[in-house]
Amino acid sequence: MKSFKIALAQFSPHIGNIDSNAQRMVEQANEAKKQNADLIIFPELSVIGYPAEDLLLRPNLNKRMQKAFQQLKEVKDIVMVFGFVHQTEEGHRYNSAAVMKDGVVLGVYNKHNLPNYSVFDEKRYFSPGHQHLVFEYLGHKFGVLICEDIWSINTVKQLSKLNVETVLVLNASPYEVGKPQHRVQTLTELSKQLNVHLVYLNQVGGQDDLIFDGSSFIINHDGEVAFQAPSFKEELYYSEFDIEQKRYKKIDPAPALDTIAEIYQSLVMATRDYVQRSGFSGVILGLSGGIDSALTLAIAADAIGADKVQAVMMPYTYTSQISVEDATEQARRMGVTFGIAEIHPIVNSFMQTLYPFFGNAPADATEENLQARARGTLLMGLSNKFGNLVLSTGNKSELAVGYCTLYGDMVGGFAVLKDVYKTIVFELAKYRNTLSETPVIPERVITRPPSAELRPDQKDQDSLPAYDILDAILYAYIEEDQSQSDIIAKGFDKEVVEKVIRLVDRNEYKRRQGAIGPRISSRAFSRERRYPIVNGWRPDD
């Protein structure tokens, strides 16, 4: 025997659908066997999916897990390494990996290092393991680790001392910008340092606000990247180990994505998986003629198909003719269902009802917000009637400073751009236009000064700093946790910094009520950034 073949199942589990996941794993294992694979590896917790959250606490989980094992035992003549929930008679619950062949479990590994930071809270559910698992197959010595374990140098060193040749790493590692590259760079050095081959297999797919990019890879013991799977694609991949050369055969990697392309593909996949797995027949959104809704429309159409997307332009007195024209033209180019619904009657009715209560109070943002809420009411009405999911179109910059209207433009079940700064929105729109022969987003949408069009001649910069300045301050404050004085020391205007930070801090209540959206950064407005709504904390200077 000159070589053996490993199958890497870059798998997108349906969280909690244990029977379906197990059946699909059986199908993939059988397909791998047809391709003469000797071993197939699946992601972390692949039987139930990651993160299963409090589904892990359901009393009948163990029974369902045992049923899944019976399904998986049907597979013959190939070794399977897969993730599952291991519950002991003593009541301990582990994040585990099983090695199975011909229906026999050859070994079980319990994850040692349980992450409890950022989006992770595994200590809520699991106990840590302490033993290593090493198995020999086809004359080759394999070790098994699960996700966080590979980042613990002590855990990896302990395993390497057992003379393993290849470490199989099962992962459910969420995406953020730059993370696929970071994994490869860091683990390349580790493989050289410990003189072991690494097979890194990652989950793929969108799950609520998390994105799993896949981006699986194999690194030879000398640091050579032998295989690199595409990002954001569910597929079976194969790699051969040359026994004589003692290395995995080099396969040309998938073309690398630049940052903007990577972000765009991640948002498309996240939107597709959220809509489809939530059971919606399609989506609906307000198409204003502005860049945020234009980009959201493009992502939605790319994710689920233009025939399942409905866009509604809802003009009012302050809506420019340019906006109507651009929205109409984009809808035509993309082939989505499109309609125009005037909101004058709704807003006027609101005004007439409220005027007796307003008395002589001067007009202010209240009247502007009524326009946004009229639009939100229309979208939710259409959603209720036809069963389509409303997509919220706001971006991270606006959400950070509260430049949005509760129960207005914030309505919706999924906020596609929730973790995307406005400056990146522009880059994504330009990128999307390069993907088709005819640009789908009219050029004027990209080049016009942004405006909410809620009052005459309104521009976003009437209320906010220029977006390049705003986003730089926000990134320093949110992603980097820098203090007010540190940000000012970078050269930003003191009053501008104070205003931006004040807006961020006072709008936590709005963000809590917003729809979830895909996480692409290390500090999204979701699981990893949690501040009390009511608090007396003030900037340190």
Swiss-Prot record:
In the C-terminal section; belongs to the NAD synthetase family. GO terms for cellular component: cytoplasm. It comes from Acinetobacter baylyi (strain ATCC 33305 / BD413 / ADP1). The gene is nadE. The active site is at E44 (proton acceptor), K111 (for glutaminase activity), C147 (nucleophile). Residues 4-243 form the CN hydrolase domain. The keyword Ligase applies. This is Glutamine-dependent NAD(+) synthetase. InterPro entries: C-N_Hydrolase, C-N_Hydrolase_sf, Gln-dep_NAD_synthase, NAD/GMP_synthase, NAD_synthase, Rossmann-like_a/b/a_fold. GO terms for molecular function: ATP binding; glutaminase activity; NAD+ synthase (glutamine-hydrolyzing) activity; NAD+ synthase activity. The keyword Chaperone does not apply.
